[in-house]
């Protein structure tokens, strides 16, 4: 009886060990678990890519959306080694990783745009970048009273601070929240303010954003090269006639063949580029199209 009991105990131990090993999936290019840091202005397109990636492979990617500055800080602090940004790493940031014998790989996968929105009751739907920099510097505008950003450390805030020659957002005439959705809601409820968001929030709106879309206008921006105004449509972003177009990148600093490499390959693949195109953004390579050529021509007219 004792012999059978020992056999049963050993069998149970083996079962537990095997089960535990199976539950701990080792991360590889197309399987395992990882965390992906995302610039909050780019969250919708990344969510769309991750959803399909997880459905195709035995992988789980936890998305953490933060401001651009917070994403970079988390990347440096090793909170995660994979990020989606609207810029490449600076020389200083690259040197930090290279000193640790890690050589980040940057993969471009889409072209996005910064969108400027205003309340539907605002009659003026045209704006120039000079007007934006004037508002950043506290100067008055005939129609708009100020700017609203998602975060003082966001990529959009950083872009306009550099454009205006400022080190940080001014204390007067400029407001900030935590998310793009909050910016859209605020502009929908307040006249005379310009909201600064990622265009993908308009192309791929959540339920809360959809409820406010009929209360806002997306402004057309002057292109100084041809002196014409352009809306942030997919075609205008592709041709860069819309002056606030920008490139998107996957930054992989894992240093090994993990999900960072797999996800970067996926978003730049045929499937990933189709997802980008369908989302309203511009892929770096347009997906191929199959053309069916008929061997005979028939006349359908009677």
Segments from the language model and where they lie:
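Exported/periplasmic ABC-transporter solute-binding proteins
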Residues: 4, 20-58, 68-69, 73-76, ...
């Amino acid at each position: 009886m004792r012999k059978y009991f020992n056999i049963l105990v050993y069998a149970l131990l083996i079962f537990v060990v095997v089960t535990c090993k199976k539950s701990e999936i080792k991360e590889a290019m197309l399987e395992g678990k990882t965390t992906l840091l995302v610039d909050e202005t780019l969250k919708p397109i990344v969510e769309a890519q991750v959803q399909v990636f997880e459905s195709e492979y035995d992988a789980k990617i936890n998305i953490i959306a933060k401001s651009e500055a917070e994403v970079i800080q988390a990347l440096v602090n090793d909170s995660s080694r994979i990020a989606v940004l609207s810029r490449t790493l600076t020389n200083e940031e690259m040197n930090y990783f290279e000193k640790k014998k890690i050589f980040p790989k940057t993969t471009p996968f889409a072209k996005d745009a910064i969108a400027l929105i205003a309340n539907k009751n605002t009659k003026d739907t045209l704006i120039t970048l000079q007007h934006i920099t004037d508002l950043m510097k506290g100067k008055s505008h005939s129609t708009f009273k100020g700017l609203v950003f998602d975060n003082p450390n966001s990529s959009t805030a950083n872009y306009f601070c550099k454009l205006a020659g400022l080190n940080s957002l001014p204390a007067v005439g400029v407001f900030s929240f935590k998310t793009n959705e909050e910016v859209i809601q605020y502009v929908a409820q307040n006249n005379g303010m310009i909201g600064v968001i990622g265009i993908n929030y308009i192309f791929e709106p959540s339920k809360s954003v959809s409820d406010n879309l009929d209360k806002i206008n997306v402004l057309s921006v002057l292109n100084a090269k041809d002196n014409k105004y352009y809306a942030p449509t997919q075609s205008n972003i592709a041709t860069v006639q819309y002056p606030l177009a920008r490139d998107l990148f996957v930054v992989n600093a894992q240093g090994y063949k993990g999900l960072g490499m797999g996800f970067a390959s996926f978003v730049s693949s045929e499937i990933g580029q189709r997802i980008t195109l369908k989302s309203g953004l511009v892929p770096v390579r347009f997906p191929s199209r199959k053309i069916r050529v008929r061997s005979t021509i028939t006349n359908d007219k009677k």
